[in-house]
């Protein structure tokens, strides 16, 4: 029997419709993950359905919903949507026992199914740190253990000291008796050090179920240690006649008791000048007898420590030149001398020795040079004035003994500038002696 081409075309079209219909009548589901105690939706969709029923069943093959009819009496299971193309249900307060494969069935001939795996995350319990007994002595071994149970999958534990992560740790995980969750334990071992006193050790649990903030346990370290001592002087160069304060700075835990001050291995020799106030030693007036070694000793319940300070008193520095100035001239003369001193000083700076040492010595030399210049100037002025005075009063002077002389012009007068050969004498002046 030979089929006509038209019949073949009809059979081909019918087969395509059947295949397409069979592909559109296949249920589609998705795997879901939920945190223990949460709510989840299970959805089954069919693109093309010829009024065929849909059904959801749990891992125990118990029917939950058949179309819109509830089959299992469980108040946690509710219908979300039911149609020929979709069947959606919700499960609230999910527990670990709800985990498994859920099946959506499409009742065609034969029945078509699709499976969705429900994964339930176990939330880890709050961590707890054990193994620390306060206080710990410096140098002792400290072992801290952080433990958290109920996580699924197993949680991760991380250690931090203040804000710095510690990676040298040991981790152990064990499965709980329910066969689903895990208990995670991590240990941290280190030596107690004074710098760790007051430090905060944090144990943090990281898990995919903790979407907001991680769970953290804290432990504050308390380390006891012997005191550390140092002495701080109030001045780096103590001088004779000045006061001095020595501060004894001590740190320790527990806090050190009041410090003890000694000098050269004995008590303080002069309690009137040397007073102790708390951690400070005050010497009101230094003298050479105070030289020596001062010791500050601090003690607590752990031990004792001390520091020493060697006191060497320096002499008070003396000025290189006296600073007293004796006034020699009147105010008018001082004005003139100051001007001359300025000019002389300027000249001295121009011609000063280039090898001269800088500083106060050069300044004193300039001052002395100015004073010498003023003295020389005044001396020269005095010589000039005296010379002019003598030149103007040159002549012959008669005394009382010459009154009886015959050649005396006048016994009561003295003639100045009256030489016998001078005919054109301009002026004669007489003075009584």
Swiss-Prot record:
Pfam family, one: V-set
Disulfide bonding pattern of the chain: 44-104, 146-203, 248-296
Keywords: Disulfide bond, Glycoprotein, Immunoglobulin domain, Membrane, Repeat, Signal, Transmembrane, Transmembrane helix
Membrane spanning stretches: 366-386
Top-level taxonomic group: Eukaryota
Signal peptide from the UniProt entry: 1-24
Topology of the protein relative to the lipid bilayer: Single-pass type I membrane protein
Cytoplasmic side: 387-433
GO CC aspect terms: membrane
CDD domains, per the entry: IgI_2_Necl-3 (cd05884), IgV_1_Necl-3 (cd07701)
Domain Ig-like C2-type span(s) in chain numbering: 127-217, 227-312
Family of this protein: Belongs to the nectin family.
Protein name, UniProt field: Cell adhesion molecule 2
Organism: Xenopus tropicalis
Gene that this polypeptide is encoded by: cadm2
């Amino acid at each position: 029997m030979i089929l006509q081409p038209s019949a073949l075309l009809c059979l081909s079209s019918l087969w395509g419709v059947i295949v397409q219909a069979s592909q559109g009548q296949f249920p589609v589901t998705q795997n879901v993950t939920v945190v223990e105690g949460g709510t989840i939706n299970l959805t089954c969709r069919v693109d093309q359905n010829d009024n065929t029923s849909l059904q959801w069943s749990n891992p125990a093959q118990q029917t939950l919903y058949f179309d819109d009819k509830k089959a299992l009496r469980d108040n946690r299971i509710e219908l979300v949507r039911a149609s020929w193309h979709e069947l959606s249900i919700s499960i609230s307060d999910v527990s670990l026992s709800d985990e498994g494969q859920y099946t959506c069935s499409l009742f065609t001939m034969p029945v078509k199914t699709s499976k969705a795996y429900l994964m339930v995350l176990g939330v880890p319990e709050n961590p707890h740190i054990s193994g620390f007994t306060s206080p710990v002595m410096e140098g002792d071994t400290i072992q801290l253990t952080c433990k958290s149970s109920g996580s699924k999958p197993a949680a991760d534990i991380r250690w931090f000291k203040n804000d710095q992560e510690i990676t040298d740790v040991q981790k152990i995980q064990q499965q709980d008796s329910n066969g689903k969750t895990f208990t995670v334990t991590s240990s941290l071992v280190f030596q107690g050090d004074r710098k760790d006193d007051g430090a905060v050790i944090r144990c943090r649990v990281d898990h995919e179920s903790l979407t907001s903030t991680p769970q953290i346990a804290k432990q504050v370290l308390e380390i006891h240690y012997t005191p550390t001592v140092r002495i701080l002087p109030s001045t780096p160069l103590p001088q004779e006649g000045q006061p001095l304060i020595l501060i004894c700075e001590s740190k320790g835990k527990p806090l050190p008791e009041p410090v003890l001050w000694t000098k050269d291995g004995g008590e303080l020799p002069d309690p009137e000048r040397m007073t102790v106030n708390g951690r400070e030693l005050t010497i009101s007036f230094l003298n050479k007898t105070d030289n020596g070694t001062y010791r500050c000793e601090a003690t607590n319940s752990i031990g004792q420590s001390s520091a020493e300070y060697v006191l060497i008193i320096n002499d008070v520095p003396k000025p290189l030149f006296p600073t007293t100035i004796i006034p020699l001239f009147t105010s008018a003369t001082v004005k003139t001398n100051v001007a001359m001193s300025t000019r002389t000083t300027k000249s001295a700076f121009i011609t000063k020795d280039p090898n001269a040492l800088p500083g106060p010595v050069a300044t004193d030399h300039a001052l002395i040079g100015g004073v010498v210049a003023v003295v020389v100037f005044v001396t020269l002025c005095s010589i000039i004035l005296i010379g002019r005075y003598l030149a103007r009063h040159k002549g012959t002077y008669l005394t009382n003994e010459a009154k009886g002389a015959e050649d005396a012009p006048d016994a009561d007068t003295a003639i100045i500038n009256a030489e016998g050969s001078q005919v054109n004498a301009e002026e004669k002046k007489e003075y009584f002696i």
